[in-house]
């Protein structure tokens, strides 16, 4: 079996909801990092790309009709390069990277672009068709995040807890205190601030140029969501989003964001053929299921499953990129994996609480950030893992080469 190498990885800045990227169509946003890969790797014959695997959790708006295919075309890839869209909700783009690696390892592909996109700002309101003449069953649904067009059997059998409600469930089941959640959130903000000040994100972010009605175009080159000046006292004053005395708040949860990310994966033969520099190889990926109402705990069983398959341990990981959907689930997972709350390996440059969580792009962002961190520190292994709505977890391990 051949190796699957990551040769390049780039992302847009992650924008706030209604922020700097609000005016960028989802399909145009998806194309930006792919176009950057093309510009950064002039030795590649782009007609030789076997496929584009792109994650997207919505698909109801401008990201409809297979945004993976549209992103490739809009980025200028030859029409001969196919594309597909993968939807595993929050884990979509991490799944895309893992599936690309599997295709290359099996020998079915030599060169694949994998990544994902989400414009949560531009997620539309949608209305289903009435089920009969003069019916009053039609209703408008907001597709930004969470449940819509709920199946009554799903509600009856599994419940339809909102994402914050699932985080409260995890906090209660695993006894994660509010103070610990706020401390986790502060660490995320502080670590992002330190990494930003050191210029760590410059190598992974491609600026987005936005034309203005008057004057020069606006250039967005920095993540918009972080709040580095947040204090523990300010977080403590926030009310719970599920219930007034709840532990999950806007301050210890990830954001609703816009962004895109893309990676170039290649076989050893493609690396040699196109003069690419292999930066890491994908060792494996695993997924796991659990009750939807505690979906945030998903990274723990997924990570344990993958590490067992690889014959590895959590102690071998030099970097652990755990998507911070909520501080509550992040702490429940790290504690179950035997990690200290402030383990320096976990999100060393901040996580989604600071950076943001544009659903379909976040997994690829984890791999991109982990890759750069391994190269900066000389580390060898990185674990990237996420929780997924409706009760799943996903994990992927890379090795620096």
Predicted regions and their residues:
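Active-site pocket-lining segment
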Residues: 54, 168, 201, 212, ...
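Flexible glycine-/small-residue-enriched beta->alpha junction loops
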Residues: 111-169
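Conserved active-site "lid/cap" helical segment
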Residues: 1-71, 75, 82, 166-178, ...
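Conserved catalytic cysteine-centered active-site region
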Residues: 24, 56-111, 141-147, 157-163, ...
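N-terminal extracellular/periplasmic Venus flytrap/periplasmic-binding protein-like
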Residues: 11-12, 23, 27-32, 43, ...
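Active-site-proximal alpha-helical scaffold in enzymes
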Residues: 86-118, 171-200, 262-269, 334-335, ...
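Condensing-enzyme catalytic core mediating Claisen C-C bond formation in acyl metabolism
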Residues: 1-24, 145, 150, 231-297, ...
